[in-house]
A protein has these predicted regions:
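Glycosyltransferase catalytic domains, chiefly GT-A lineage
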Residues: 1-353
Length: 353
């Protein structure tokens, strides 16, 4: 039986991306799992773009910030950072990779994610890749492996599938060869043009094969260890149905995808409590308000631009169109200007006093 301190929870930031997501993750993790090791990995090329407020928060919560060497994927494959992070050395006996858009839902025994001789995973929600199932035959043939007879139930569609797992939560023994085999398998598949549409799903395609090739078996965990909160908010009746299902699940590891999906679930109050304990913000909504405002403005600008682009415009409409076009260009430029993006953040987010 492992102690909480025998586990390392690790994740990736990619400035300016995933910074506020990581605030939610480390706040909820430290709130519920006070003795676990927390490690944030950042590409070394982005070292100078880790903002001071985040370094300060990490220090206050005993989060170890480490830097990743360049990945071997060409062209760049951002999901490859998780595999590269998995390959790094960590002292605790068990490593658990978490996508950064995750919150810890409650205190629980991490041994539930650490079955000896296994890699802990949760099935993907839907057929993001692998439909038709015959696509897997070519992948397994690359490694002279038979397609397994085993089937898993996809967590959202409830359809049966050849083992296909969400790579947002992966638990494995730190001293095993699994991570290196994951990298080797992913690189091999990435270089095979016969495997169509392999990106961005490469990490998940390689995952079940890497488990087997490393001499491990998959510990197929229940959905509560990677509970997706995403839903179609434009269809309230369907969203309400999904929330009922989410609320009925014992969500220990909450894969919220976007903070807006936290709202309206039974997990919101607890996540907000963790955030308010370690930061000056009362919850996820306040923490991410500026991001939401920028997203709302962009949506409005794009709507105006698209509605006027192809029509015969009046003088007044032409003024609106030119203003929207200019603002659209400014928004697009700001998205790729890392320095400008980081300047929006406060100097500190720690609680005052």
């Amino acid at each position: 039986m492992l102690r909480q301190s025998d586990f390392s929870l690790f994740f990736v930031i990619d400035p300016p991306a995933l910074l506020l997501d990581s605030v939610i993750l480390v706040s909820t993790a430290r709130y519920h799992l006070p003795d676990v090791e927390l490690v944030a990995y950042c590409p070394d090329a982005k070292r100078e773009f880790v903002p001071a407020f985040l370094k300060e928060l990490y220090s206050s919560l005993n989060v170890d910030l480490r830097f990743l060497p360049p990945a071997s994927f060409s062209p760049h494959y951002k999901q490859g950072n998780k595999i590269l992070a998995a390959c790094q050395s960590r002292k605790p006996a068990q490593s658990i990779f978490l996508d950064t858009d995750i919150a810890i839902g409650r205190n629980f025994d991490l041994n539930d994610m650490a079955k000896p001789g296994h890699v802990g995973v949760v099935p993907e929600g839907i057929f993001t890749w692998g439909k038709p199932q015959s696509l897997w035959s070519r992948v397994y043939a690359m490694f002279d492996m038979d397609v397994p007879d085993e089937r898993v139930t996809l967590s959202r569609s409830n359809l049966q599938s050849i083992p296909y797992f969400n790579a947002g939560v992966v638990s494995f023994p730190s001293n095993s060869s699994f991570a290196e085999m994951w990298m080797e398998t992913a690189n091999a598949i990435d270089g095979n043009d016969e495997i169509r549409h392999r990106r961005p799903w490469l990490d998940q395609i390689a995952l079940p094969l890497a488990i087997t090739r490393s001499g491990k078996s998959a510990h197929v965990m229940e959905p509560g260890f990677n509970l997706s909160l995403s839903r179609n908010l434009d269809k309230p009746h369907l969203a309400a149905r999904d929330v009922l299902k989410m609320n009925a699940t014992d969500g220990r590891v909450i894969h919220y995808h976007d903070p807006v999906y936290i709202e309206g679930t039974r997990y919101a109050a607890d996540i907000d409590k963790a955030i308010s304990t370690f930061t000056k913000y009362p919850g996820a909504a306040a923490l991410t308000q500026q991001t939401r405002d920028r997203r709302a403005e962009a949506a409005r600008v794009w709507r105006v631009f698209e509605s006027l682009k192809k029509k015969k415009r009046t003088e007044e409409e032409d003024v609106l169109f030119r203003e929207a076009r200019q603002r659209k260009s400014e928004i697009k430029a700001s998205r790729i200007n890392t320095v400008a993006g980081l300047s929006r953040y406060p100097a500190t987010i720690l609680p005052s006093g």
